[in-house]
């Protein structure tokens, strides 16, 4: 006996992927998320491929996962996908201490972030 299946929270033409415990501040991660928001999935992958930001590789991995979820789990056409949402959330913060002068110590924050990417299939517009 198992639990009843939960209803799908996304519409039928959307798929998502979540990356948790990314070792970067949410502010820096949001700079990369803004690059891909609203773009075609293929163009977003190309942008991330050549981005010089360190976290761009992890964002690319999450986007590839969202595209694979759309293709394999929801039977969506990969060529018609756009990044409809890319948002960043706070994760945990590791706190460390660094020795300072005169026997004191300073606190160092090492933040983590969460990234959610939602891809949506848009119908190809009929060109007349």
UniProtKB/Swiss-Prot annotation:
Q: Name one Pfam family in it.
A: Ribosomal_L22
SUPFAM superfamilies, per database record = Ribosomal protein L22
Supply one GO molecular-function term: structural constituent of ribosome
Name the GO cellular-component terms: cytosolic large ribosomal subunit
The record's keywords, sorted A to Z, are: Ribonucleoprotein, Ribosomal protein, RNA-binding, rRNA-binding
The protein's matches in CDD domains, at most eight in alphabetical order, are given as: Ribosomal_L22
GO process annotations (BP): translation
Tell me the PANTHER family matching this sequence. Answer: CHLOROPLAST 50S RIBOSOMAL PROTEIN L22-RELATED, LARGE RIBOSOMAL SUBUNIT PROTEIN UL22M
Function, as annotated, reads: This protein binds specifically to 23S rRNA; its binding is stimulated by other ribosomal proteins, e.g. L4, L17, and L20. It is important during the early stages of 50S assembly. It makes multiple contacts with different domains of the 23S rRNA in the assembled 50S subunit and ribosome. The globular domain of the protein is located near the polypeptide exit tunnel on the outside of the subunit, while an extended beta-hairpin is found that lines the wall of the exit tunnel in the center of the 70S ribosome.
Which family does the similarity line name? Answer: Belongs to the universal ribosomal protein uL22 family.
**Subunit-structure text:** Part of the 50S ribosomal subunit.
HAMAP family per UniProt: Ribosomal_uL22_B
Please state what the protein is called: Large ribosomal subunit protein uL22
Origin species: Nitrobacter winogradskyi (strain ATCC 25391 / DSM 10237 / CIP 104748 / NCIMB 11846 / Nb-255)
